[in-house]
A protein has these predicted regions:
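Acidic, low-complexity terminal tails and accessory targeting/binding regions
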Residues: 1-2, 76, 89-103, 155-158, ...
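Phosphate-coordination/substrate-recognition cap region in phosphate-metabolizing enzymes
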Residues: 40-115
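Glycine-rich phosphate-binding loop signature in dinucleotide/nucleotide-binding domains
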Residues: 48-51, 149-158
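Active-site metal-binding loops of divalent metal-dependent hydrolases
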Residues: 10, 166-167
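An N-terminal RHG(E/S)-centered segment typical of histidine phosphatases
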Residues: 1-52, 68-72, 76, 204-219
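Short glycine/proline- and acidic residue-enriched helix-loop micro-motifs
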Residues: 108-137
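Beta-strand elements within well-structured catalytic alpha/beta cores of enzymes
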Residues: 3-7, 56, 157-164
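Active-site signature of alpha/beta-hydrolase-fold catalytic machinery across serine-
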Residues: 69, 171-175
Length: 219
């Protein structure tokens, strides 16, 4: 059985900061709490026997840093492969804007539809069909290995960690081919530092759990 862990990077704003909509064009590092969340992610993976065999992130520093810290805290020395398909979405005119300005432009209803149904607001430079295709292709490759000697494709069993951002993570459950059922059972957003777990068994993907928030107080 292949296990796919989707994790959101840790915090990029401190408690007293004014947060903005951080997208693909805003490359921010983790703040101290974000580093603690990354460490808690690693501890969670270790405690729950979810040590990753392969690790991926986006090309943005907040995801690479989260992955690196998580691996340090779960004792895994695997490299982190940064892929652009996991970069956060481009929020267009709302990139790096405060939430009140975003709502003033697109309206609260559009933002609610984004958070509950993954319907992309007008003006954002993002194609959800491309994101879904990327997840499907990645998930398919994650479950198969090609034996170049025999030219046979085998099913594989491993644990894969992907550290990405909120906008991209919500499209991962499309690999189950029943996103509506997922959205009825779970909130589609991942909190900062949170993770979701998908498993491939009986030739299909299932969401085992979503928006798990590891306790940063556990060392």
């Amino acid at each position: 059985m292949t296990t796919l862990i989707i994790a959101r990077h840790g915090n990029t704003f401190n408690a007293g900061d004014t947060p903005t909509r951080v997208g693909a064009r805003t490359d921010m590092p983790l703040v101290e709490k974000g580093k603690q969340q990354a460490a808690a992610l690693g501890q969670y993976l270790k405690t729950h026997n979810l040590l990753p065999d392969a690790v991926y992130s986006s090309t943005l520093q907040r995801t690479k840093e989260t992955a690196k810290i998580a691996l340090e805290h779960c004792g895994v020395k695997n490299p982190v492969y940064a892929l652009k398909i996991f970069d956060e979405i481009d929020y267009g005119p709302d990139e790096n804007q405060t939430e009140d300005k975003v709502i003033a432009r697109i309206g609260q209803d559009a933002l609610t539809q984004w958070d509950k149904e993954a319907i992309v607001p007008n003006g954002w430079a993002f194609d959800p069909k491309e994101a879904i295709q990327n997840w499907n292709q990645f998930a398919h490759q994650a479950t198969k290995t090609h034996d170049t000697l025999t030219n046979i494709v085998h099913d594989i069993s491993e644990t894969i960690l992907v550290v990405t951002s909120n906008g991209i993570a919500r499209f991962a459950p499309y690999i189950t081919n029943d996103f509506d059922a997922f959205a009825r059972q779970y909130p589609i957003k991942l909190s900062t530092g949170a993770l979701g777990i998908l498993e491939f068994s009986k030739e299909r993907w299932h969401v085992k759990d979503w928006n798990i928030r590891p306790d940063i107080s556990i060392k």
